[in-house]
Every structure is written in C-alpha cells, then in structure tokens.
C-alpha cells in the first residue's frame, strides 16, 4: 500500500457472498483477496453466512479444524458457532462461516435494541431481512470476539461491510465500543434498485423522489432503514461508481466519502495462449452441441455465438434489450452467418430437461426441440419466454438466428452443459449487457478479460469507467449512451453490434479480441486497489481521532468479556432523559408498544406533536419524545387538560 496511507494490520471483510455466490460481490471479494494476500496474509479475514450447514458440503469452502481452535472454543462459550477454513478461490483466503440461527430466539430483542439505539425501523422486515440482520449481528460478534482474544489495542483494524445485508454488524461494533474502523460499501441502493426495477425513470426524476416515501411505497422500509443507518454510523461510506454515488447522496442520509470501483484479477483467465485456445475450442464445441440438440439442427463451426449472463433482473440488466435486439436482427434482411444467442440467467427451475439430456446422450428422440434447457418452476409467468411468445421467437427450422434460455447456475453441475460460466463465456463471439441499472457491471469486464468483445451502457459503472479511463479506440467494447427515454435507440445499437461482429473478417475479429483483453487491464486490482486503500486509511484516521473513547479497551483488551449482557433490552436511556408532563405519560408507554406502527391514529398523534421532527426522525416516536422541547410538551399538556 502507498507509504503515505495508514495501512490496516487486520482487515475483516463481511459479505453475504463470501463462499456463497449470488452475484458480482462474490467476484469483487474473491479477486481482491488474492491481490491482498501478499500484504495481509492471514490478517485478511473474510466472514460469510454458513448457508450450507444443513445441506451438502459447500463447494466454495474447505474447513480447517486446526485454525484458531483455541479462540473458536472460547467464542463458543458466548454462543458463537462458526466454521473456520479456506475459501476455494485462487489464494485460498481465510474464511469464517457463521451460524446465525442460534440467535433466532433473540431476534425481537436485537431488533428492539437497534430501534432504540439507532432508529432502525424493522417493523416491515420479512424473514429475509431478519436473516440478514442476524448474520450481520453475529459477524460483528465474531470480530469483537477475535479482537478481545488476540489483539492488544495497538493494531490498526478495519472491518469492511458490503451491502445493507451486513450493516447490523457496523451497528454492533459501534455499540460495543471497540477501536475497529468500519467501512460500509454499498453496491447499489435499495430504493434505486426498486425504482429501476419498477419501470420508473430513476435518472431523470431522481431529485423528485423522497427515499423514505418510496421505500414505504415499495414495502422496503426495513431494508432502506438499515442501509441508511449503516451508512450514517460507519466511519467511512463508499460505493462502487460515480453513478451510484449520485443515488447514495440523494437517497441516503450521508454523502459518499470514497468511490471504490471494483477490480479484477486476471489469474481467473487462461495463463497461456495454448490453454486459451484449448478452453475456447472446448467451450464452442459444447455451446454448439447444446444449441444443435435444443434447435434440432446442426450448428456450423463458424456460427456467431452471442450471450448475456447475470441476475434475473429483466429490465435492470437489459435482458429486454437483448431479446429485442436479437429479434430485430432476426426479422431484418440480415443474410450473414448463423447467430445463436444464449440467455444464461439463473431462475427457479426443477432440474435439467430430461428429454434434452437424453438427446445429448444419444438416447432420446432426434425430433425433440426446446428453447429452455431446464424445467421452469412457473413458466406461465416467466418474462423471458413470455417475450419470446410476444415476438414469435420459436427457433423455426428455417431461421438463421436462434435464441436459447439457460435458467440454471452454470457451476459445472447444471445437468446440461456441466461446465462453469467462465468455461463457456470464453467460447462466445460477443456478449451484450445493455443495462439500465448497473452500479458497476462485472459481466462486461469478465467478458473482456476472456477476450470476448462486449457491449455495455453509459448507465453502468464500468461503462463510465471505460469512457473516462481508456482514451483510445476500443473496438473490443461498445458503450451505448442510455437514458430514461431512448430504449429503442439502445435496441438498435445492440442489434448493430451483433451485425458488426457477425460481418467482421477473421483479422478484424482478432483485433477486437486483443483490444478486449487490453481494455480489461484498466480494472485490474493493481490499478483499482488504491481507492480501497484510501477508504481504509481514512477510516483508520477517523478511528484514531476518536481514540479517547477506546483507551480503556485498548489497555485491557479482554476486560468485561464474560460480562456482556445479551438477554434483555433496557429502556434506562429514555427513562432518565425524558420528563413528560403527567398528562402525557401515556405517550411514553405508547412509543414502546409496537402497536403504534400499524395504527394510523397513533402515527397521527406522534406527528401532531411536531410534524417537522416526526419527518426528520424517520417516523420514530422515541426520537420525537427525546427531541421536542419541554415547552411544547407543556403546551400539549394544557390542551389535554
């Protein structure tokens, strides 16, 4: 790390995607850990949820029973159950998977404490929300336990928490008063994602939206509240792109401190030219075999293979644009090479299509065809196949352009391809990621790293990064200007990109592929890590400035370890600071009874005390009672009398 920056001696990193692939955050942390290994070694500690504890062995995790076994035994005495080992990614970083289910019976107590202490509004939170709160809470306890067992108070310790799902860990650490510098990184905003996913104009109309009101409208108040309080209470608040920083600055109660763009480690790509050629040939062969089995027609060796991958966010990820663009080429007078388009988007399914598998194994009917490789759980409600029907995309035998939906995670064991996503990606000729909402955009970056030309948009963080950090011609990537009102222009641009790739000469194609790889290097961790270093350094500086608050703990790191009380909430703080007139004592009782949350009359009552304070408090009656002047309460008491 740069000499003029404070370097952490220990870095804890908490995410729902540690050893648990859901989206791009998995790649962020996995690749960054490899880069940081030489600097932090075993002092870079990753914490994730033990979501595989009741199922088969986690393919991403290898437990090491010998690692820190004394501490593990000590932590178990305070109810912390965890598995310690290595993440099965390059570099094999230390990973701790925590079991948060033993705290289920404490859920209400924990939520009440966060409400009283920080104003986190969890009333509307469903089980997924509560599960996330418990995970972050236990992750915070793990960091506290490790600190008290191993550290002296002299070390510089940073804990980075990714996304709102881990934010309760920040609140826990702040509550227990350890000298641990906290960084909160959001890879999107709750409200921004909701607006974009519900076809509302996020970018043109952003300033007109009230984040709290929109959160209530979309029933994500709990998520938004935790996200807001996490940003507010962290030492340093970061996000992954300038476009998402704009969201954060508007919807959350704090400005972003540092923009920390994501990076990539090219160790994930073939190490030699020979390996690259072998992997590309194997991928193309498999893609052509499956396409032939699904369509019922052989696929030519020089066919153009196009793809899109990522989460099933139909509009946000530009899946709608992808389908419409392919259809635009299909219905035009295009007479070039065969084009086979693969939509590799995981969705709910009930396993591989058995007739397709039989056909691939040479046992099934040669006449069987399908557009979907796996049995969809609710095909009648699926938007991708629904759009196929609307546009008449049926992979007709005489059509030179065909489309396939692959709704399974490509983890090497999907039942049809039985190859991992990267091992198939390398065989494509073009990827399209025409996103509407894409805070960063790992998928086009991954595509470039594997030498596959791609398309993204100006609304993707990575697209903006290319525009500002690669100042040469870049035929390997097209960045399409996208806004709230030019959908058809984006479809046309994507269709033109397909035609372009289909018509280039072999020599031009090689130039595109070489440029793709070159562009990807601007986002290597060796170039991007500086922004994370800044965030860690600033967090340490902020923590140092508050060291007086931590002096007692620093001198006696294990003091009070056995005396932490976790069984019951205390209302002492409100009882000793509030002096309500006798006629209004009922407000005290009502504010602590969750009944007010769903009673409109009760809400109106608290609002009437002081509408401005009610709004600024996020509709928190405890804050209202603490904030409003005694003069105002006396006025209300006289009215009540």
Model-found features: residue ranges?
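A short, well-structured beta->alpha microelement
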Residues: 563, 579-619, 628-632
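Catalytic cores of nucleotide-sugar-dependent glycosyltransferases that transfer UDP/GDP/TDP-activated
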Residues: 1-563, 567-571, 587, 622-623, ...
């Amino acid at each position: 790390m740069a000499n003029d920056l404070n370097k952490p001696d220990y870095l804890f990193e908490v995410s729902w995607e540690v050893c648990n692939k859901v989206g791009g955050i998995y790649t962020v942390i996995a690749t960054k850990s490899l880069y940081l290994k030489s600097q932090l070694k075993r002092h870079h500690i990753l914490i994730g949820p033990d979501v595989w504890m009741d199922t088969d062995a986690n393919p991403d995790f290898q437990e090491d029973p010998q690692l820190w076994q004394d501490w593990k035994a000590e932590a178990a005495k305070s109810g912390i159950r965890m598995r310690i080992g290595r993440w099965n990614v390059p570099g094999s970083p230390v990973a701790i998977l925590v079991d948060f289910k033993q705290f289920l019976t404490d859920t209400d107590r924990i939520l009440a404490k966060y409400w009283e202490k920080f104003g986190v509004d969890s009333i509307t939170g469903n089980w997924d929300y509560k599960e996330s709160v418990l995970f972050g809470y236990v992750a915070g306890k793990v960091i506290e336990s490790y600190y008290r067992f191993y550290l002296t108070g002299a070390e510089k310790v940073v804990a980075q928490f990714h996304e709102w799902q881990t934010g309760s860990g920040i609140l826990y650490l702040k509550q227990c008063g350890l000298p641990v510098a906290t960084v909160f990184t959001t890879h999107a905003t709750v409200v921004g994602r909701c607006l974009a996913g519900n076809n509302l104009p996020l970018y043109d109309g952003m300033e007109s939206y009230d984040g709290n009101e929109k959160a209530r409208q979309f029933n994500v108040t709990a998520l938004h509240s935790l996200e807001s309080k996490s940003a507010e209470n962290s030492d340093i608040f970061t996000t992954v792109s300038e476009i998402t920083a704009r969201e954060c600055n508007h919807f959350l109660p704090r400005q972003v401190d540092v923009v920390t763009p994501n990076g990539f480690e090219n160790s994930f790509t073939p190490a030699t030219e020979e390996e690259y050629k072998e992997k590309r040939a194997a991928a193309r062969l498999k893609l052509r075999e499956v396409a032939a089995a699904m369509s019922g027609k052989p696929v030519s060796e020089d066919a153009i293979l196009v793809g899109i991958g990522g989460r099933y966010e139909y509009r946000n990820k530009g899946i709608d644009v992808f389908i419409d663009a392919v259809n635009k080429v299909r219905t035009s007078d295009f007479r070039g090479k065969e084009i086979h388009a693969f939509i590799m988007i995981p969705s709910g399914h009930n396993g591989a299509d058995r007739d397709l598998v039989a056909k691939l194994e040479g046992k099934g009917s040669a006449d069987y065809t399908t557009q979907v490789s796996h049995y969809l759980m609710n095909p009648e409600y699926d938007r991708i196949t629904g759009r196929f029907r609307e546009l008449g995309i049926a992979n007709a035998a005489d059509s030179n352009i065909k489309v396939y939906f692959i709704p399974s995670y490509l983890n090497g064991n999907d039942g049809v391809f039985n190859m991992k996503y990267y091992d198939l990606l390398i065989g494509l000729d073009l990827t399209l990621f025409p996103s509407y909402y894409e805070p960063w955009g790992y998928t086009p970056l991954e595509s470039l790293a594997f030498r596959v030309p791609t398309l993204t948009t100006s609304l993707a963080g990575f697209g903006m990064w290319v525009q500002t950090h690669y100042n040469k011609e870049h035929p390997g990537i097209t960045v399409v200007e996208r806004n709230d009102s030019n959908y058809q222009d984006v479809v046309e641009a994507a269709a033109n990109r397909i035609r372009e790739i289909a018509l280039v000469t072999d020599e031009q194609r090689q130039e595109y592929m070489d440029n793709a790889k070159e562009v990807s290097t601007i986002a290597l961790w060796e170039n991007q890590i500086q922004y994370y270093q800044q965030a860690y350094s600033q967090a340490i500086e902020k923590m140092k400035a508050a060291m007086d608050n931590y002096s007692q703990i620093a001198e006696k790191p294990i003091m009070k370890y056995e005396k932490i009380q976790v069984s019951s909430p205390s209302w002492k703080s409100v009882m000793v600071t509030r002096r309500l007139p006798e006629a209004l004592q009922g407000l005290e009782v009502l504010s602590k009874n969750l009944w007010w949350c769903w009673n409109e009359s009760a809400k109106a009552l608290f609002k009437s005390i002081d509408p401005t304070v009610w709004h600024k408090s996020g509709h928190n009656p405890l804050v209202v009672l603490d904030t409003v002047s005694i003069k105002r309460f006396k006025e209300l008491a006289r009215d009540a009398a």
